[in-house]
Design a protein with these regions (language model features):
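A short, proline-enriched helix->beta-strand linker immediately N-terminal to the Walker B motif
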Residues: 171-175
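Conserved ABC transporter NBD signature motif
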Residues: 64-76
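Conserved small/polar residues in nucleotide/adenosyl-binding loops
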Residues: 259-261
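Hydrophobic anchor residue at the start of the ABC signature
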Residues: 114, 166, 177, 190, ...
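ABC ATPase "signature
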Residues: 234-238, 246
């Protein structure tokens, strides 16, 4: 398989209030193949979101990428200029946030917001973008896909808004989508429905994914492989089946003891 993402010896530093630098990501390395969905899992503070953001060339406020490389489709996101990164974001690499509500402007229609990235980057005509959006609404099992785009964010459910957030990320046919705990606020039944819809569209399109979560039961629904993180370090990497059926690291087994799949 061809790798879309290659992270090598990634290090990220944070600056404390006293001005001291602390390494919060310490030498993390892993790959993501084309069309593969990889989950980053660990407790709060394990570094999973920090690592995911480096795939867009981002560092959190007060942090900096201090070492290693982050390659996406042959581009090192660490060394690209900000102008070059801006071209990659929204086209080759996209992001689905934890809060779909925060991603939408309450005063604009859903359709206008979903297709906005295609206008910004000149990816297709407005008519083509609207047709593509309806295709995605259908593929993501949204009700009334032909007309849901004319609604406003407050007129759809939380689960529907999360799927629409995914449609926004997928509209430009990206190579990689980063999902940052997007189903946390949903009930279990809705979570499963949304995850299945995400996975179906990703697999049909051959799109790679990074799924950030603290919940192994959730990632079992969508991930091909799992990277277990603690304290900014990799503790275990394996296929979802390998991790669920034969976890080797004590921390992974601890996470498994908290779930029922």
């Amino acid at each position: 398989m061809v790798n879309l993402v290659e992270i090598r010896d990634l290090k990220v530093e944070a600056t404390t209030d006293s001005g001291r630098r602390v390494e919060i990501i310490n030498g993390v390395s892993f790959d993501i193949a084309e069309g593969e969905i990889v989950a980053l899992i660990g407790e709060s503070g394990s570094g999973k979101t920090t690592i995911a953001l480096t795939l867009m060339g981002h560092a959190r406020p007060g942090c900096r990428i201090s070492g290693g490389s982050v390659s996406v489709a042959g581009k090192d996101m660490v060394t690209l200029s900000e102008k070059q990164r801006a071209r990659v974001r929204g086209t080759e690499v996209t992001y689905v946030p934890q809060s779909a509500a925060a991603a939408f402007n309450p005063a604009a229609t859903i359709m206008d917001q979903v297709i906005e990235v295609t206008r910004i980057h000149g990816l297709m005509s407005a008519d083509e973008a609207r047709l593509r959006a309806v295709e995605l609404f259908t593929a993501l099992s949204l009700p009334e896909p032909e007309t849901i785009g004319s609604r406003y964010p407050h007129q759809v459910s939380g689960g529907q808004l999360q799927r629409l957030s995914a449609a926004m990320a997928l509209i430009g046919d990206p190579k990689l989508v980063i999902f940052d705990e997007p189903t946390t606020a949903l009930d279990v039944t809705t979570q499963i429905e949304v995850l299945r819809a995400f996975k179906s569209v990703m697999k049909k399109g051959g799109i790679s994914g990074v799924y950030v979560s603290h919940d192994l039961a959730v990632v079992a629904q969508i991930a091909d492989r799992i990277v277990v993180l603690k304290g900014g370090e990799t503790k275990e990497i394996g296929t979802t089946k390998e991790i669920l059926d034969g976890a080797k690291h004590p921390y992974t087994r601890e996470l498994l003891s908290l779930i029922h799949i």
